[in-house]
């Protein structure tokens, strides 16, 4: 039997590789492996917990330089004294807020996820963009279409 979903996933993975977006490509390949093996029984859990676990791992990666000492406390303190660092802090707050809106939107309108992924891959492939992630893109979409 022909599996259209598998074909779509393979197409998105190919776009990920073509656009040098290995994060998207590898993620989709992992999901393909889950789909075609007995691991598919874990999909409900992945759908419920995957985003939260991903955000935890991302936060660990962002906080690692502080925890390891690579980013010393003096640098953190000085970030409140330099205007460029203050702008960076403000932008970080805005982007985090957008990401929060994106999580809400993706949860309430999951049909938008494919469009966000395709748009991200096309932006990387056609405009030499950087795959900053579907959460921020979803946050921007939420400003246009609303959160619900």
Curated annotation (Swiss-Prot):
Keywords: Cell membrane, Membrane, Transmembrane, Transmembrane helix. Disulfide bonds: none annotated. Pfam families: DUF441 (PF04284). It is a multi-pass membrane protein. The keyword Transcription does not apply. Coiled coil: none annotated. The chain crosses the membrane at residues 14-34, 51-71, 86-106, 121-141. One of its GO terms (cellular component) is plasma membrane. Its main location: membrane. It is found in: Cell membrane. Belongs to the UPF0756 family. PANTHER family: UPF0756 MEMBRANE PROTEIN YEAL. This is UPF0756 membrane protein YeaL. It comes from Shigella boydii serotype 18 (strain CDC 3083-94 / BS512).
């Amino acid at each position: 039997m022909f599996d259209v979903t598998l074909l779509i996933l393979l197409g998105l993975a190919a776009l990920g590789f073509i656009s040098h977006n290995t994060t998207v490509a590898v993620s989709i390949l992992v999901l393909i492996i889950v789909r075609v093996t007995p691991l598919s029984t874990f999909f409900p859990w992945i759908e419920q917990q995957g985003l939260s676990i991903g955000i935890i791992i991302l936060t660990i990666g962002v906080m690692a330089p502080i925890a390891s000492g690579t980013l010393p406390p003096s640098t953190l303190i000085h970030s409140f004294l330099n205007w460029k660092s203050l702008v960076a802090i403000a932008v970080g707050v805005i982007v985090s807020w957008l990401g929060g809106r994106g999580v809400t939107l993706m949860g309430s309108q999951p049909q938008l996820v494919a469009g966000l992924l395709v748009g991200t891959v096309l932006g990387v492939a056609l405009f030499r963009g950087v795959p900053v992630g579907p959460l921020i893109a979803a946050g921007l979409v939420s400003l246009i279409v609303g959160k619900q």
